[in-house]
């Protein structure tokens, strides 16, 4: 027989600029995705007024010329004029706001800088933004104190807007990072969504029951959820804090050494006769795939009732992870049909109705 399903919602994308420059959106339409949520992990295309090259990890969205939207209303107008083949809903990135008002991203913001960020955030919410995202694990936001985010989150309350976060750590201190996210949600009385929940790093494998127990505990008194992608590898910029010989790391791009794209960091270091860390420093700025998760943890998180499906695909990456094109078919074909992790209707719910409800998307996710 045949199955009728709503268009899928990709809740975790970095399609901010590609929906304008490549509105056909073939990587998403080919999977059945009809709505994308952009602005995740603290990085968004707007509101941004760059004074130079985009800081890491905003460079995942494109080069300086891609950031042409000083106000969210400018970005919204550009998306509408591009007529992308998918619906677009947008978060405002904390790191994007910081880049507009701070001369040094490796510190916490001053009271005046926070006030300026709040004005921009409110203006964006007035223009239709869904909420605020943070990427506190990245160097460009890691030194932001919790109070900085608490103050920004207060702007979300009146709108019932959502707070999503790439946690301050997905490694050993992940539970403390989750507690920080829940604190922010309680403070502003807003829903919290933890981005790509995972147990990162070999020393962290097997801890998914602890993470999910913390999520369930928080959900008893507050609206919280998470998204995840159906793969045991992550992809982002090359982060020196994640350089290790405990698992494989593949370089996807490098500005000073473009020919190294597609090669393993271990091989590059061996060819150069240097340590992994020295090789990583030479390659930066660069992108990488980290094979740093355990399949059992991925399955456990994916199957949990509070988890949604998000691809976290990187359309600007010259060697993108398969999740850009294949996340949703992998959930349906591999995890639901072949593995039997959950029935088809549960798989569909995780990429439609649940997603629409958590992000407050009306007239989406249901038939």
What spans do the regions from the language model cover?
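Structured alpha-helical segments in the cores of large, soluble enzyme domains
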Residues: 116-129, 145-158, 174-187
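Active-site mouth loops of central-metabolism enzymes
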Residues: 10-19, 101-115, 138-144
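C-terminal helical cap
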Residues: 264-299, 329-367
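Divalent metal-coordination and catalytic microenvironments
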Residues: 1, 12, 32, 88, ...
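Polyanionic/metal-chelating signatures
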Residues: 47-68, 73-76, 95-112, 185-192, ...
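Acidic-and-aromatic substrate-binding clefts and catalytic sites of carbohydrate-active enzymes
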Residues: 18-20, 141-144, 169-175, 201-206
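Divalent metal-dependent hydrolysis catalytic cores, especially in the metallo-beta-lactamase
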Residues: 27-65, 85-100, 125-140, 157-169, ...
């Amino acid at each position: 027989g045949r199955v009728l399903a709503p268009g899928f919602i990709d809740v975790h994308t970095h399609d901010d600029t590609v929906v304008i420059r490549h509105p056909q959106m073939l990587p998403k339409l080919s999977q059945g995705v009809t709505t994308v949520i952009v602005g995740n992990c603290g990085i968004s295309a707007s509101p941004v007024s760059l004074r130079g090259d985009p800081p890491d990890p905003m460079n995942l969205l494109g080069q300086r010329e891609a950031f042409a939207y000083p106000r969210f209303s400018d970005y919204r107008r550009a998306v509408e004029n591009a007529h992308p083949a998918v619906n677009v809903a947008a978060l405002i990135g904390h790191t994007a706001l910081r880049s507009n008002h701070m001369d040094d991203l490796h510190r916490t913001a001053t009271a005046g800088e926070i006030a300026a960020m709040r004005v921009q955030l409110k203006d964006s919410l007035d223009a239709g933004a869904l909420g605020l995202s943070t990427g506190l694990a990245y160097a460009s936001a890691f030194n932001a104190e919790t109070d900085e985010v608490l103050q920004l989150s207060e702007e979300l309350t009146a709108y019932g807007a959502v707070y999503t976060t790439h946690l301050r750590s997905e490694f050993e201190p992940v539970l403390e990072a989750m507690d920080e996210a829940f604190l922010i949600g309680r403070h502003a009385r807003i829903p919290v969504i933890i981005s790509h929940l995972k147990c990162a790093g070999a020393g962290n494998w097997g801890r998914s029951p602890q993470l999910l127990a913390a999520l369930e505990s928080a959900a008893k008194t507050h609206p919280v959820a998470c998204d995840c992608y159906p793969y045991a590898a992550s992809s982002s910029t090359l982060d020196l804090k994640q350089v290790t010989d405990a698992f494989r790391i593949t370089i996807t791009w490098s500005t000073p050494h473009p020919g190294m794209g597609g090669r393993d960091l271990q091989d590059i270091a061996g060819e150069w006769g240097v340590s992994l860390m020295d090789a990583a420093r030479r390659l930066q700025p660069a992108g990488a795939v980290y094979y740093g998760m355990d399949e059992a943890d991925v399955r456990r998180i994916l199957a949990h009732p509070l988890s949604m499906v998000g691809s976290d695909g990187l359309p600007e990456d010259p060697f993108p992870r398969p999740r850009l094109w294949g996340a949703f078919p992998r959930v349906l074909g591999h995890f639901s049909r072949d593995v039997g992790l959950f029935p088809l209707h549960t798989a569909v719910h995780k990429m439609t109705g649940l997603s629409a409800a958590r992000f407050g998307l009306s007239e989406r996710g249901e038939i």
